[in-house]
Amino acid sequence: RQMCIRDSHSRFSAPSEEECLGHINSRLSESSDFLRKATRLVITLGTAFVYRLKSDGRIVSNCHKLPEKMFDRQRLSTQEIVEDWKPLLLALWEQNPALKILFTVSPIRHWKDGAHENQLSKATLLLATDALQKDYPGRIAYFPAYEILMDELRDYRFYADDMLHPSPVSYTHLTLPTT
């Protein structure tokens, strides 16, 4: 039986809770060291939908194949996203005041709830990143990966066979310069 923690990615599973927590803590330490030295951080938001644990209302990062009945799925509001990100951003800048953050919205389509809900989710993320950029001018920037793929590269050759993910050709257009 594999042990896992609901607030972690599924790759952090182990035969015992102690071993699982050891892997998680080791990775947290490495990530913390990296972020203290980084000059830039790119954050890509994929969807405004989250899963909340019914027992306590907590948002979980991974359902770990637990029964669906244990969770409520909801789309966060723009304000909820902004308010959730502010403490994290302030904590990052407390550790690394020079850190510049670049937000993007993933062009990968989430069709689970249909095209309309996907667009509402992406619009929510776009409004949230815009609000954060306005709240922290000079510290947060936005790269329009979503807009480039949806508007400039809307030809189907820029999509993979599943018509949801970008094709390898589109990545050449979406890659940031390395300066």
Residue ranges and their predicted role:
Residues 160-174:
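Histidine-centered active-site loop/cap adjacent to the catalytic His
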Residues 45-56:
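Short, solvent-exposed beta-strand-terminating loops
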Residues 90-119, 152:
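Active-site segments of SGNH/GDSL-like serine hydrolases
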Residues 2, 6-34:
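Basic, amphipathic N-terminal segments that precede the first structured/catalytic domain
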